Amino acid sequence: FLLNLSINRKLPKSDGFRLYRNNESELYLCSVFFKYLVFIIIPKILNSFFSILFSPRETRYSVAYTYHQNHTKLLSQYIEIPNPEGRFLADPFVFAYNENNYIFVEDFFYKDNKGRISVIKIDGDKNEFLDVIIEEDFHLSFPFVFKENNEIFMIPESHENLDIRLYKCLEFPYKWKLEKILMSDVSAADTLVIKKEDTWFMLTNICSSKSIDHSELHIFYSDNLKSNAWKPIASNNLVIFDPLRGRNGGLFYHNEKIYRINQVHGQAHYGKSFNVNEIILLSKNEYIEKE
């Protein structure tokens, strides 16, 4: 090359930009593309095609329950609550009141593509749908219900209204009123609150990217449940960005331990499964959980 350059006093003619320099590399590229086409693209196209042909036109969920002590019952042994016509039930939260058990649910109406909050009374293998108890001009879901100082509160998801709102029960289980807007101008989903000593912690799902999958777990704290100035825990504490762990699914207490349920989302599959995580540490400075 250098000898030719010294004799001709010019660079050899270029064939133009080439990502690969020889036929062997080009064959490898074709092989990779073929495998990608066969194993990724074509299955996706076929899956979408068959989904359109054979899947139900409308998304449907349902709620089921059971009684047990050791958390070992199979889902097939649960009692399914029938969906009302033209609707589906989702996001169940169980609440005990005066020796009776109630399930608060998202009650989604297909006719206006909007969820309300409804309540069902359960008694053994019998269940009674009571009524829609909270309805707004926007979608509501995930009715996280809890008790504090003999008062009953609920934080339903209201991300369409760009806020996090606290409702107070005036007459159980039917009558509720909006007590406080805890956060404004935020698209947050599936909010939970935990009280530890004199501090309230809010675990909620927000997307930093402004998308609507709400896959990040953000944690705030306040000394007052009804505050509208919640602060994030220490800035050096990492928010959970993992879509396989971030999204809240519920909360329960067992043997003096706190457990957070998280939803697991697959590719184009909302609510593929769930995990149970023990909350090891929750403070103004740090959050640690283990599966």
Protein language model features and the residues they cover:
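Donor/substrate-binding cores of folate-linked one-carbon enzymes
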Residues: 1-25, 29
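Carbohydrate-active catalytic/glycan-binding domains of CAZyme proteins
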Residues: 30-291
